[in-house]
Amino acid sequence: MKSLSIVDEEKLQQFYETISINVKRIRQEKNKPQLDLVLEMGLKSTSFFSKCENSKDNHHFNLEHIYKIAIILDVDISEFFKGI
């Protein structure tokens, strides 16, 4: 088993950014406006979603978000992890 100490902050940030880029790309490919997706997810803030999607202010999607987005956009959840 690998030690968690090998996962530095930069690698973790790249992980989150890759997921964010994939979420945004897939959402746009599906022609789904941010507001519609946010409402269908049951979120109360498009600002929060936008920050997650653009990796701003240390905001990122959690597993529940990724799961809901995959269902709403009708994509396999693994699509969000491509490039990692």
What is each stretch, according to the model?
Residues 27, 38-39, 70:
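The alpha-helix within a helix-turn-helix
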Residues 44-45, 55-57, 84:
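The DNA-recognition helices of helix-turn-helix-type DNA-binding domains
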Residues 31, 56-71:
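Short, basic-rich loop-to-helix N-cap that marks the start of a DNA-contacting helix
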Residues 73-84:
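Short C-terminal boundary/hinge segments that cap the last helix of small helical domains
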Residues 24, 35, 67, 78:
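Residues within the helices of the helix-turn-helix
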Residues 31-52:
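Short alpha-helical DNA-recognition segment
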